[in-house]
């Protein structure tokens, strides 16, 4: 079986992808963010029998030498390492350029030099901005509505340029909003669940009118692997989406009904995006991934929410419910 590197393996989607790859028999190398505590993020929570199967490389995606060293001897790379919090990108855009654009450049250059068989570069539905039409297919225009989305657009275009200029075997993987166990409370679903499970009677949220297309994380991980395993995806940009949308307000009401029907939603102004930066509608098309791969959505939204609530209930100690997680 192929040897693969997962950058950002210590994060939310990356840790689930790492697990899914192990289950499919891949030889997995995990690139985690170096820290002096020698912690490996969410990988530390995996059972020992799984963790023992993973080769861990701690480094910094911004360091080209470390990235190159990590990529030596691997057949394929799943590049997920990134800064992803939109509110923090308003405060620290420089760090997003360094991590998301330069980090991707480091992966692409190393892949070119090392002759890597295939590279999956992770995009985001945020590159589309507010939908100009729905469902949003891969031909939809890009709109940089936040420093975060602008850096992901830049990373996508770098990946495209390396495919066109150097014939580098790249696939751009574009998941719509993903949720599930291990997600931080900077994302809306765990924000709602953690406040409710902490016994809050008032659930603080930002704007309730935007709509989103939510993937359960195990379906997202399966999408990455399906794109990697298909010979038809090189040079392509591919959505992972459910073609189902729900407003943040309706989402909150559904979760509140399951945990504490007496809770009320209140607007917390610090959670509101600047008006022109708010992405008001995201509803993705998934015809292309179904055409080029054998991917199919396996989890309903309701199943995913149930699994997420159950996991967070068992792991509330990992969350700080009294602060706004930027």
What do the PLM-derived regions correspond to, one by one?
Residues 62, 91, 99-102, 146, ...:
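Residue-level signal for the nucleotide or nucleotide-sugar donor/cofactor binding architecture
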Residues 153, 178-191, 198-201, 217-218, ...:
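Glycine/proline-rich active-site loop of Rossmann-fold NAD(P)-dependent oxidoreductases
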């Amino acid at each position: 079986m192929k040897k693969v590197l997962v950058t950002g393996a210590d994060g939310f989607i990356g840790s689930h992808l790492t697990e899914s790859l192990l289950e499919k028999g891949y030889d997995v190398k995990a690139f985690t963010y170096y820290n002096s505590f020698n912690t490996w993020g969410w990988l530390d929570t995996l059972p020992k029998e799984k963790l023992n199967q993973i080769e861990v490389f701690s480094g910094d995606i911004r360091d080209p030498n470390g990235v190159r060293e990590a990529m030596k001897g691997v057949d394929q790379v799943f590049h997920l390492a990134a800064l992803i919090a939109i509110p923090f990108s308003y405060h620290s855009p420089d760090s997003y350029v360094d991590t998301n654009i330069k980090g991707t450049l480091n992966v692409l250059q190393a892949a070119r030099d090392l002759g890597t068989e295939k590279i999956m570069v992770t995009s985001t539905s945020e590159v589309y901005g507010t939908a100009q039409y729905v469902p949003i297919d891969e031909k939809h225009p890009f709109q940089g509505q936040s420093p975060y989305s602008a850096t992901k657009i830049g990373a996508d275009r770098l990946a495209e340029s390396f495919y066109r200029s150097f014939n580098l075997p790249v696939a751009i993987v574009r998941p719509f909003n993903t949720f599930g166990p291990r997600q931080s409370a900077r994302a809306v679903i765990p924000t709602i669940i953690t406040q409710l499970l902490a016994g809050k009677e008032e659930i603080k949220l930002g704007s309730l009118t935007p709509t989103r297309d939510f993937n359960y994380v195990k379906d997202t991980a399966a999408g990455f692997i399906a794109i990697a395993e298909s010979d038809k995806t090189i040079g392509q940009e591919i959505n992972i989406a459910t073609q189902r949308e729900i407003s943040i307000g309706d989402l909150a009401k559904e979760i509140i009904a399951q945990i504490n029907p007496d809770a009320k939603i209140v607007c917390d102004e610090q959670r509101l995006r600047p008006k022109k930066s708010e992405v008001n509608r995201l509803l993705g098309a998934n015809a292309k991934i179904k055409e080029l791969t054998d991917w199919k959505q396996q989890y309903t939204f309701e199943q995913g929410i149930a699994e997420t609530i159950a996991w967070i209930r068992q792991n509330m100690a990992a969350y700080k419910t009294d602060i706004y997680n930027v």
